Amino acid sequence: MSNQGKCPFNHVAGGGTTNKDWWPNQLRVDLLNQHSDRSNPLGEKFNYAEAFKKLDYKALKADLVRLMTDSQDWWPADFGHYGPQFIRMAWHSAGTYRTTDGRGGGGRGQQRFAPLNSWPDNVNIDKSRRLLWPIKQKYGQSISWADLYILAGNVALESMGFRTFGFGAGREDVWEPDQDVNWGAEVAWLGVDPKRVNDERELTAPFGATHMGLIYVNPEGPNASGDYLAAAKDIRATFYRMAMNDEEIVALIAGGHTFGKAHGAAPESHKGPEPEGAPIEAQGLGWTSNFGSGFGKDTVSSGLEVTWTKTPALWSNNFFENLFKFEWELTKSPAGAKQWVAKDAPEIIPDAHVPGKFHKPTMLTTDLTLRFDPEFGKISKRFYEDPQAFADAFARAWYKLTHRDMGPKARYLGPEVPKEDLIWQDPLPAAIHNPSAADIADLKARIAASGLSVGDLVSVAWASASTFRGGDKRGGANGARLALAPQKDWEANQRAIKVLPKLVEIQQASGKASLADVIVLAGNVGVEQAAKAAGVAVDVPFAAGRVDARQDQTDVESFDVLESAADGFRNYSKGNLGVPTETMLVDKAQLLTLTAPELTALVGGLRVLGANYDGSQHGVFTDKVGVLSNDFFVNLLDMNTVWKAVDDSNEVFEGRGRKDGQVKYTATRNDLVFGSNSILRAYAEVYASSDGKEKLVKDFVAAWTKVMNLDRFDLA
């Protein structure tokens, strides 16, 4: 018998020590290769918007209504109604969104993948998804999981007597976990790394929750202290990261806790492993409990055993009634979690599964915050005294919660999209220009004759378009918000702002196009001039139709989060990033939905076009600035140049001749990474080769056009 026959089979694909094990700080270029067609079973020709048009929307909603009261033996409905758990599922799908980087949220159906499917805060939500499966199976690809999660939450509210604000579909599923979202550095669930929360209980960017594995905050108060006043700071920190204000916070918490219950029938030691850690025969279900039946009255989820209202399957104002009517004393759930019970109160809260059995009202520590925090308390009292104001505030806040990460309203699908434009949707006016081919040609001629350099033209277009974020679909060139606060005041945009008056002059003289279109067209003219100077004739694709937003349509505070701490494409950095500069370049590329080859072509092209934010010479490895050549790559890979940092910060470098020691170039880490990182160097070598000149021009034009049109959802 051979040695192979005697030994265990231990050489499966992907086994063994990985590059990440050897070099933990290796640049994550792989983040730019996520969600490719190779992982999508529907194929590149599948169009979700077209598939959704074929959906029998009324029939789907009717099926969801029936599901709400169709209690299953394997997971019985609390109070005979699944609505509360579907509200929780929808909330926790959308609730991972954070404004800091636009990542997270419910727009991609990520809740069914790790780590979210196994977060402690999502315990037993896997059961809600399984309850939905027969409906998803029936309607197939005409409704995405991502849309179904949110719609199920809406229908749950409606089936319990609440009037929702509306629903917009359009969330397209992906087929693997997002790798780009930084959920934190903790290695234990519910841990708190010092990098997440500082001594003043302030969340650091980009995190949106106070603990690893929580959607928001610890419901027992900071560090399970039971301190409802201290909890206010954590609540604000997390909800503010979702762009919610105090009124929306109160409405969401109180509205959500009008329904259902929390589950803590026994200590958490009774729970089995989460879905990703469960055995294969569990078929993706987790947290199997060995306490009693394991479900129904014996359910162990959060460890808290709280029912807030006397009508937990019906909309009411009873949450606020109980909150203000009773005094509260600290107690513990059967699982040992800190919670509150109404003092000297009658047993008026129905049991979820035993008819005729009642309990005293109970609350979470974070519920009491809504009464005893001075500012939250004022809002809560107003909602208590004006139930209609509460209902309206909750409807609007719920709509915002579940749609905040979808981008502009133009992306919404379906018959229930509200007509009202909301400021958080970054509204745009109706188009008033429709330039003809002759109009566009005239504008291009005016731009070419303006005296603006290639670097100026390219810089202004890049500054306008590169605010786009693929996570929440915000930003981009449409709207020309570069000319408005806050973007006009950003440090990185000051070169571009100096160019704007000339483009405004051209736009007004023509009167045939929006400023937004003129800005993009200016960049295209610059690229065409640079390509022609390199000996390659190109027509950069241009799609007119952009409009110009007004300042009153632009929430300054909301747009402030779109400002990049670093934009390596134009060699900009605020400094003191806390991470290697080149990681921020990859981060920016990922937000722009670029591939690694697109990143490479764009940086190399922008450098020789002279598009640095401050006009500096860092990375401008050419004596033909304004020509779209491959000089950046040729000279970067030239072994006759030796690089050395100019100081201990290792941020700026000098490239000297190997023989004469004379300074030839200067560069930043954003430049040198294309020679140091083995993957990026492989791409750089393609463009530095003798047959790479024309390829670079064509690849640059394609990537450039992609960035200019990232927010053109009207073109889909």
Curated annotation (Swiss-Prot):
Q: Any keyword Transcription regulation?
A: no
Which coenzymes or cofactors are required? Answer: heme b
What does UniProt give as GO cellular component?
A: cytosol
Q: Where is this cross-link: Tryptophyl-tyrosyl-methioninium (Trp-Tyr) (with M-242)?
A: 91-216
Biological process annotations from GO: cellular response to hydrogen peroxide; hydrogen peroxide catabolic process
Q: Write out the similarity annotation.
A: Belongs to the peroxidase family. Peroxidase/catalase subfamily.
Q: What is this protein called?
A: Catalase-peroxidase
